Amino acid sequence: MGKRPLVRRRGRGGMQFRAATTGKIARAKYPAFELGEQREGTVIDLVHERGRDAPLAKIRFEDGIVSYVPAVLGTRVGSSMNFGLKSEIRDGNVISVQNIPDGTTVCNVEKHYGDGGAIVKSAGGNATVFSHGEGGVVLKLPSGRFSTLNPKNRAMVGTLAGGGVSERPFMSAGGKWRRFRSKGRKYPIVRGVAQAAYVHPHGGGRHQHVGQSSTVSRNAPPGAKVGSIAARKTGRAKIKDRR
């Protein structure tokens, strides 16, 4: 009897496929302040959280509330961060996007008002306030796409710290395995043709070959839904002759 493919087991969401909660500190979200409320906090520590590349800034407010938010470039212990509509346009301050001028770089942007920051949270990431209009505020995301947001949504001015982490090479396979494990991702990934026939539909045989069409239907059963799923085209791309 065959075994379920790894992709099917992972889709079920067992404990061995989930991101570890050990080493997690707190949710990196903005505090739930009122829209017109003006608050100031002080950075009391910069901490590293497992599975997160950008450092977290531990902020303490006047009333004793402690919150964690992703740190921007230039953040240091003892620096102040302002939350509110009347805050200065300065790196680290959290302001509604309606009050941020065009061309300003922002990060940790709320996708929906009050969610505490949901997009542009990766290390070294930043978005650009593109324009203001009746339909909302348009942001240019790191991917190059444009997104229209509610003018009340909050964003942090500046660029997130830790941008050079992707340039650091992995000196060993074990280091890469630990990094992927902290994020709940699979490494290394074994090709289907290199596996046995009872483990993967592409496995088995005297030599490594798929042995059948690698394109499968979108509605294929879970045990057979491996390979190129609902591919529009396969093979090498044709280069058009521009002569």
From Swiss-Prot:
Gene3D superfamilies: 2.30.30.30, Nucleic acid-binding proteins (2.40.50.140), Ribosomal protein L2, domain 3 (4.10.950.10)
The protein's role, per its UniProt record: One of the primary rRNA binding proteins. Required for association of the 30S and 50S subunits to form the 70S ribosome, for tRNA binding and peptide bond formation. It has been suggested to have peptidyltransferase activity; this is somewhat controversial. Makes several contacts with the 16S rRNA in the 70S ribosome.
Compositionally biased intervals (Basic residues): 233-243
InterPro entries: NA-bd_OB-fold, Rib_uL2_dom2, Ribosomal_uL2, Ribosomal_uL2_arc_euk, Ribosomal_uL2_C, Ribosomal_uL2_dom3, Ribosomal_uL2_RNA-bd_dom, Translation_prot_SH3-like_sf
Family: Belongs to the universal ribosomal protein uL2 family.
Name of the protein: Large ribosomal subunit protein uL2
Residue segments, region Disordered: 202-243
A biological process from GO: cytoplasmic translation
Keywords linked to the UniProt accession: Ribonucleoprotein, Ribosomal protein, RNA-binding, rRNA-binding
Matching SUPFAM superfamilies: Nucleic acid-binding proteins (SSF50249), Translation proteins SH3-like domain (SSF50104)
Pfam families, A to Z: Ribosomal_L2, Ribosomal_L2_C
GO MF term set: rRNA binding; structural constituent of ribosome
Recorded superkingdom: Archaea
PANTHER family for the chain: LARGE RIBOSOMAL SUBUNIT PROTEIN UL2, RIBOSOMAL PROTEIN L2
GO cellular component terms given for this protein: cytosolic large ribosomal subunit
Organism per entry: Cenarchaeum symbiosum (strain A)
Subunit: Part of the 50S ribosomal subunit. Forms a bridge to the 30S subunit in the 70S ribosome.
